[in-house]
């Protein structure tokens, strides 16, 4: 890849140059790919090489005598409180590439069983609706409306039914970006638009959902006073960066203050759901068992004659994990392998 610039005689607006030449980092090449076919080929090759080394070869080396791969779950590694997976990391099976997703096909249940996958739907946005008490967001969820399409309609000033797929995708980036404390610069990079346009999108977003702006500002102010962020369930995350003399560190601390209560609450909820589901499977004497947690998703190895019971347990255990102003929702699927179940 390092010779690409020379061989193609590329003239790159804003091309990043390092000590050894122009950067060939993925984010740089992705911007070039539409104009230079060889760059797209390089990115594809890198992706395939990563799939082979990390997942095809890497996972095969982790298979134990019982034919299974056993991961380790960690409760205290991530700052947000999410459970992480190591040796190997089974929460990191790729989802962006179709070929990467197909790696999930190699994960199969034992004979007489199937996989049942239950995934929270927009849990962080639902937590935001509850914690901010924004009436518009709460009302949209209670009416089971398309949140991203509603946001697009408001931000881009078009009737709901005329929102394009592109506008909806951009609105989705704004909705989730707000949760992560995204800046106008960060949003402009994500959407390939100017910083001015991104700032206008965010301003219109906060006009649409005014209580969210007040809520986020309040989180930062409270964290400055106390030195920590707190989840809905009272779990604290210290934020020493807020008292730093370095502007960049303070800005980072402010983003933590914005997103930790939301992300952390979602992490708390999935843990409660795991306990609920595990207890119910045990109390009802089922042979089905909880295998894996991947962020907002639970994977159950389900005996085929216990399918309806497990569905009921997942519905109750996950939806009942927290009492919010809006209902928790899950998407549930079954399959003969992890790919089909997802």
Regions found by a protein language model. Give the residues of each.
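Conserved catalytic core of nucleic-acid polymerases
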Residues: 70-71, 75-78, 153-286, 292-293, ...
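Short acidic (Asp/Glu) and glycine-rich catalytic loops that position anionic groups and cofactors
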Residues: 3-13, 19-24, 83-84, 103-111, ...
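Short, contiguous acidic/charged loop-to-helix segments that flank catalytic cores in large enzymes
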Residues: 60-61, 137-139, 162, 257-266, ...
